Design a protein with these regions (language model features):
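Short beta-strand elements at the ligand-binding edges of bilobed clamshell
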Residues: 61-63, 117-140, 153-157, 185, ...
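Extracytoplasmic "Venus flytrap"
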Residues: 25-49, 53, 60-76, 83, ...
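Hydrophobic alpha-helical segments within soluble ligand-binding/sensing domains
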Residues: 71, 126-151, 165, 193-196, ...
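Hydrophobic alpha-helical
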Residues: 76, 86-104, 170, 184, ...
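Flexible loop/hinge segments that line or gate small-molecule binding clefts
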Residues: 93-132, 143, 150, 156, ...
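Short, solvent-exposed amphipathic alpha-helices that sit
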Residues: 38-52, 133-140, 161-180, 194, ...
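Sec/Tat signal peptide C-region and signal peptidase I cleavage site
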Residues: 15-21
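Hinge/cleft segment of the Venus flytrap/periplasmic-binding protein
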Residues: 23, 158, 173, 271-328
Length: 328
């Protein structure tokens, strides 16, 4: 009888363990905003992750609406509703730290993705080095204008890590061309419409003086292109650069109107989700996304690394058609 009771207890424990392992986990994604294509691609990649499609993960994607206070409120919601893990792409490098701390204090792991936060409490971060992209895009503009003339810089939201680091990279490239003058430098908040308005004003203020346009993302570079065209000017007479590899930018690269650098939203999103599941499962999980085999220089390493650096891919005449073929 005693042996039977022990056997029954063991079987019950095994069933309980199995049920716990199979229990659906709740993961929240808190991107800074969903208006532009890049974050829409990022979100779609999360939703396309095998663990989400199989039902293993219940995923909720919030819209931060480009507002740090909105993101803080969303963290409060996820904490109250006892999410198992959070993926965070903050709008503000400093303001986001309090949100991270509140989640960690509640025992919820936070995985950073795409943009950074000034906090040592992140479990891991999956993203790309924006200083590198800022340097590369500025250098492409400076190379085209022969390291002389005048440029303008259209920045992202002031205080976001991408804006800070890309500007650092922009300045590093500009320091190599001391004869180049920066005529204007303002934010357009990742917005194509805001960038178009800025560029229209600058073209009026500096007629026939602007040679290069450094847009810290593709949307803003595309807005500048629209302003140039609206002014009746030849786009190809300007050196224009952006970052992200959004669909319209790929088309503009193919048309010879700008340069761009692909930021792999899919790798950043799915890598972060694999890490979120890994930590929610207390390490009892093997990554399901194929991104870990795509980038040999970004190994999984047992899910223990603090930073996973997704490489940049310059958009070229040789790869633009292949990249366009991946867009629906």
């Amino acid at each position: 009888m005693r042996k039977l009771l022990i056997a029954l207890a063991s079987a019950t424990a095994l069933l309980a363990t199995s049920a716990a392992a199979q229990e659906k986990i709740k993961i929240g994604a808190a991107p800074y905003g969903l208006n532009a294509e890049f974050m829409q691609i990022w979100t779609a990649a999360l939703q396309d992750h095998p663990a989400v499609k199989s039902g293993e993960v219940e995923l909720t994607v919030f819209d931060g609406r480009y507002d740090a206070l909105v993101q803080q409120d969303q963290f409060k919601t996820m904490i109250t509703q006892k999410y198992n893990a959070i993926i965070f792409a903050p709008i503000d490098v400093d303001a986001g730290a309090a949100a991270v701390q509140s989640a960690v204090d509640a025992g919820i792991p936070v995985i950073g993705s795409n943009t950074r936060v000034n906090s040592d409490q992140l479990t891991s971060y999956v993203g790309s080095d924006d200083t590198v992209s800022g340097y590369l895009e500025a250098k492409s503009v400076l190379d085209k204008i022969g390291c002389k003339g005048n440029v303008v810089i259209i920045e992202g939201p002031v205080g976001q890590s991408a804006q800070i680091q890309r500007l650092e990279g922009n300045k590093k490239a500009l320091a190599e061309c001391p004869d180049v003058k920066v005529l204007e430098d303002q934010t357009a908040n990742w917005s194509r419409a805001e960038a178009q308005t800025l560029m229209e004003n600058w073209l009026t203020a500096h007629p026939n003086q602007i040679n290069g346009i450094i847009g810290q993302n593709d949307e803003m570079a595309l807005g500048a292109i629209e302003a140039v065209k609206a002014a009746g000017l030849d786009v190809k007479s300007f050196a224009i650069a952006g970052i992200d590899g959004v669909t319209d930018a790929l088309r503009a690269v193919k048309a010879g109107e700008m340069t761009s650098i692909l930021q792999d939203a899919r790798a950043q999103a799915q890598g972060a989700l694999d890490l979120a599941i890994f930590n929610a499962r207390k390490g009892d999980y093997k990554p399901e996304s194929d991104i870990w085999t795509t980038y040999k220089d970004m190994p999984w390493n047992g899910g223990k690394d603090k930073t996973y650096n997704v490489p940049w891919t310059p958009v070229t005449a040789e790869n633009v058609d292949q990249l366009l073929s991946t867009r629906k």
